[in-house]
């Protein structure tokens, strides 16, 4: 199964990377490594996660982030990577744009 990270999700990753890098030098890189590892696991586990707001939601193991994706034919499309600490109405609004 192929994984495709859409530009909206890439933007989410960049924003979170910048935030964590300002917290501690190297933490942003650790964040990216962790999230990419979580996303890579979708090759084996895509479609097994709960559906939330029309997307499957993978919760990151080390950071309070969720990966929102859909399985389309033989591909996993990652639409958003969002901080779970955000206001739920903000998350709904963000996902409704996809």
Predicted regions and their residues:
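Short, hydrophobic secondary-structure boundary micro-motifs
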Residues: 29, 50-52, 90
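Residue-level recognition of specific faces of alpha-helices
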Residues: 12, 16, 38-41, 57, ...
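Amphipathic alpha-helical recognition patches that constitute DNA-binding helices
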Residues: 4, 26, 30, 57, ...
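Basic/aromatic recognition patch in beta-strand/loop cores that engages polyanionic ligands
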Residues: 37, 44-76
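Enriched for short, Lys/Arg-rich terminal
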Residues: 70-98
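Arg/Lys-rich, positively charged N-terminal/basic patches that mediate binding to nucleic acids
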Residues: 1-32
């Amino acid at each position: 199964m192929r994984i495709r990270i859409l530009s909206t999700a890439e933007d989410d990753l960049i924003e979170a990377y910048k935030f964590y890098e300002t917290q501690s030098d190297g933490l942003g890189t650790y964040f990216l490594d962790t999230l990419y590892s979580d996303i890579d696991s979708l090759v084996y586990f895509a479609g097994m996660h709960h559906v939330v707001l029309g997307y499957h939601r993978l919760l990151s193991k080390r950071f309070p982030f969720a990966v929102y994706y859909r399985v389309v034919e033989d591909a996993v499309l990652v639409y958003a990577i969002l901080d779970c600490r955000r206001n739920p109405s903000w998350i709904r609004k963000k996902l409704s744009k996809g």
